[in-house]
Amino acid sequence: MGMWSIGVGAVGAAAVALLLANTDMFLSKPRKAALEYLEDIDLKTLEKEPRTFKAKELWEKNGAVIMAVRRPGCFLCRAEAADLMSLKPKLDELGVPLYAVVKEQVKREVEDFQPYFKGEIFLDEKKKFYGPERRKMMFMGLIRLGVWYNSFRAWNGGFSGNLEGEGFILGGVFVIGSGKQGILLEHREKEFGDRVNPLSVLEAVKKIKLQTPASGRS
């Protein structure tokens, strides 16, 4: 009887733990980024002789859509990148560029990511685009049903990847208006494979006010 009670108790505890892991109760809440915070981020080009510049250059004239990639080798990140790339013809029509930032360069990970993301990619060494407060998902991600659903969807879409590089710091997607227009959309991953809604991205992009030479001087 005692062993039976212990067994039932253990199963019950495991069930409760599984239930709690699949709520958002224990997920760290993202803190919204201010435009001034993003503007001051130092980015590097990925050339042999890299150029360092302030991130605001990316959106100053025409706004921008920016993906903060959790890990280029992750098949879930590659699936989200492909989602964003499906918007590229419409973004080009609207005159809004699409960029990505990565937090590290590991082997050929960035090069191997480029078939899924054909926009320009920059290095954010200080991981500022992943802040202001970096959020991590550790092994709890392995028992979240949402992660399993996201994984199945990506696998079913034919995406594959590897385990190279840091992948616990969660990424996101930003739509930023031109000049001082501000952040029009800020999507922060709450779990692995939590993709932004492409329609939400397009809706935000349509609000961008492109700067003409005259408005840029005003």
UniProtKB/Swiss-Prot annotation:
Compartment list: Cytoplasm; Secreted
Major site of localization recorded for this protein: cytoplasm
GO molecular function: antioxidant activity
Annotated S-S bridges: none
Domain of life from the UniProt record: Eukaryota
Flavoprotein listed as a keyword: no
Cellular component GO terms held in the UniProt record: extracellular region; mitochondrion
Tissues/organs with expression: Expressed in kidney, liver, skin, and brain. Widely expressed with highest levels detected in adipose tissue.
PANTHER family associated with the record: PEROXIREDOXIN-LIKE 2A, PTHR28630
Family: Belongs to the peroxiredoxin-like PRXL2 family. PRXL2A subfamily.
UniProt miscellaneous comment: The active site cysteines correspond to the redox-active cysteines of peroxiredoxins.
Role this protein plays: Involved in redox regulation of the cell. Acts as an antioxidant. Inhibits TNFSF11-induced NFKB1 and JUN activation and osteoclast differentiation. May affect bone resorption and help to maintain bone mass. Acts as a negative regulator of macrophage-mediated inflammation by inhibiting macrophage production of inflammatory cytokines, probably through suppression of the MAPK signaling pathway.
Protein's name according to its UniProt entry: Peroxiredoxin-like 2A
Gene this protein is translated from: Prxl2a
